[in-house]
């Protein structure tokens, strides 16, 4: 049986600090190849996700890794000891990137040939897994698996002319199959994940399956509590399915450093391991790697790699029904507030520092993530914008919990263990001055302000959260937030950008 990675380094652009080895503030090109090598060699991460979704991708990464760092990769076999996993564009969703999907799939046999030359015959398959984002049905992942088998791996048998086959020209094509990891990002698909996995299992008959649960995008679209509870439902469903099919399922969770995006940081990883029992692989995003002291980062990754994997909590039907009800109540409260703040979020997001050479995510080419009726930036910019205007998104929608009875509240607390801790971590950055300033700048309605005030009042009076600065860093962040809003109002944008960067350094994450 292959090693199932415990940690997966990603290219999420959530870092405030720029690593010393980067040639510029934007990590791109050859720097991303170097970053992949350093993730393995310096940080001890088991797996690197190579992203072809929403950005220009280098499909020659394996060639560059093996030729630039031969000593390391002779000792650590790519595909056996350490892993490289492609994140594809979803051709159903990202129309302009359909051919990038095809190009990335076509590059997999090239990596196989390179490994044959480097390691010798039959030693390893360097790239054998792909991640499909925004998966909503089993048909999508079945189609990806079959596309590779039929359109890529089997093309070597095509006859060109008069008995001459493709393989006579380019050689035989390997691997013959790939493993597809669904990345499930929307609430309904997370809560019905068993249908996606079981459908794929019945058709493809894999020996095991890795399933990627998003934590960041569902938080943006439906609110933090909805995201957490949807992941808990998904983990329970996957565990039950694994038992009933007698088939191993290894969940991956996509978590960032701030509470809204998962709260996996070198300072909080133990609580996240406790929160998401049953998860095999945790994403190590850029803020985790670059915004904390290196020794602390390396030690945290080592601890995650060596931690014990506990079984997921199996939910009884009545518990699951309560959690589903909470996600609906929470989203109904959260989304209208976000829609009202959309102009502010979009205006601030374009001023945040850029950390990756990503294509535009607004307009014809690219995909703005949407919550309800409005378009929003990517989750990192979304979170960074709300923190910067002094309203951490973790607080939005919280008063919907007032609809729970005592039994429902107990079920909620049992299934979101670190709820109060996550909320308190975020609430330190709440800025009381924000209300007047955002009303003035973006003409935010009194109704929206009143709803946010209800949420923060509930957080304070019922949950017992202290809002606002409690130490030097949080007080400085609040001051910077006011200065940012004042400079933005006066259109002194160079100063606005400076304050945004300073706040991100304090948070140890852009968003």
Curated annotation (Swiss-Prot):
GO biological process: carbon fixation; oxaloacetate metabolic process; tricarboxylic acid cycle
Disulfide bonds: none
Record field: catalytic activity: oxaloacetate + phosphate = phosphoenolpyruvate + hydrogencarbonate
UniProt cross-references to InterPro entries, sorted A to Z: PEP_COase_arc-type, Pyrv/PenolPyrv_kinase-like_dom
EC number: 4.1.1.31
Pfam families (alphabetical): PEPcase_2
Annotated GO MF terms: magnesium ion binding; phosphoenolpyruvate carboxylase activity
Cofactor(s) needed by this chain: Mg(2+)
UniProt entry tagged with the keyword Transmembrane: no
Keywords: Carbon dioxide fixation, Lyase, Magnesium
Role according to the record: Catalyzes the irreversible beta-carboxylation of phosphoenolpyruvate (PEP) to form oxaloacetate (OAA), a four-carbon dicarboxylic acid source for the tricarboxylic acid cycle.
Sequence similarity: Belongs to the PEPCase type 2 family.
Binding partners and assembly: Homotetramer.
Protein known as: Phosphoenolpyruvate carboxylase
Source species: Saccharolobus islandicus (strain Y.G.57.14 / Yellowstone #1) (Sulfolobus islandicus)
Taxonomic lineage of the native organism: Archaea, Thermoproteota, Thermoprotei, Sulfolobales, Sulfolobaceae
């Amino acid at each position: 049986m292959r090693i199932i990675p415990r940690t997966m380094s990603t290219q999420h652009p959530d870092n405030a600090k720029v690593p010393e080895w980067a040639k510029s503030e934007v990590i791109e090109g050859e720097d991303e190849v170097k970053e992949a090598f350093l993730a393995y060699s310096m940080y001890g991460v088991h797996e690197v996700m190579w992203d072809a979704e929403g950005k220009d991708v280098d499909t020659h990464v394996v060639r560059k890794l093996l030729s630039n760092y031969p000593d390391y990769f002779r000792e650590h076999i790519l595909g056996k000891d350490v892993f490289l996993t492609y994140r594809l564009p979803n051709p159903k969703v990202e129309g302009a990137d359909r051919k990038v999907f095809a190009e990335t799939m076509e590059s997999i046999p090239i990596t196989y040939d390179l490994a044959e030359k480097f390691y010798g015959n039959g030693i390893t398959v360097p790239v054998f897994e792909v991640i499909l984002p925004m998966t909503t049905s089993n048909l999508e992942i079945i189609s990806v698996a079959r596309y590779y088998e039929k359109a890529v791996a089997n093309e070597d048998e095509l006859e060109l002319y008069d008995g001459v086959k493709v393989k006579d020209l380019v050689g035989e094509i390997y691997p013959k199959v790939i493993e597809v990891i669904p990345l499930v990002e929307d609430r309904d698909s997370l809560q019905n994940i068993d249908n996606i996995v079981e459908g794929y299992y019945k058709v493809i008959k894999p020996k095991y399956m890795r399933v990627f649960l998003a934590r960041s995008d569902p938080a943006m679209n439906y609110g933090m509590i909805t995201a957490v509870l949807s992941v808990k439902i998904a983990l329970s469903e996957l565990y039950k399915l694994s038992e009933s099919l007698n088939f191993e399922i290894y969940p991956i969770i996509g978590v960032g450093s701030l509470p809204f995006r998962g709260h996996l940081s070198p300072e909080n990883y133990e609580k996240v391991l406790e929160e998401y029992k049953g998860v095999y692989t945790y994403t190590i995003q850029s803020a985790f790697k670059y915004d904390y002291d290196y020794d602390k980062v390396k030690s945290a990754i080592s601890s995650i790699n060596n931690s014990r994997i506990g079984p997921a909590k199996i939910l009884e039907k009545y518990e699951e029904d309560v959690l589903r009800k909470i996600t609906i109540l929470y989203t109904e409260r959260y989304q209208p507030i976000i829609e009202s703040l959309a102009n502010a979020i979009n205006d601030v997001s374009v001023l945040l520092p850029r950390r990756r050479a990503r294509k535009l995510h607004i307009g014809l080419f690219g995909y703005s993530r949407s919550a309800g009726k409005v378009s929003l930036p990517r989750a990192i910019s979304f979170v960074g914008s709300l923190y910067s205007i002094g309203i951490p998104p973790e607080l939005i929608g919280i008063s919907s919990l007032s609809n729970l009875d005592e039994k429902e509240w107990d079920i909620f607390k049992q299934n979101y263990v670190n709820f109060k801790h996550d909320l308190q971590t975020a609430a330190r950055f709440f800025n009381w001055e924000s209300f007047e300033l955002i009303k003035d700048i973006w003409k935010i309605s009194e109704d929206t302000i009143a709803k946010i005030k209800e949420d923060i009042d509930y957080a304070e009076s019922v949950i017992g959260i202290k809002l606002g600065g409690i130490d030097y860093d949080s007080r400085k962040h609040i001051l910077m937030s006011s200065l940012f809003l004042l400079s933005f109002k006066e259109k002194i944008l160079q100063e606005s950008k400076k304050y945004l960067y300073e706040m991100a350094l304090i948070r140890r994450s852009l968003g």
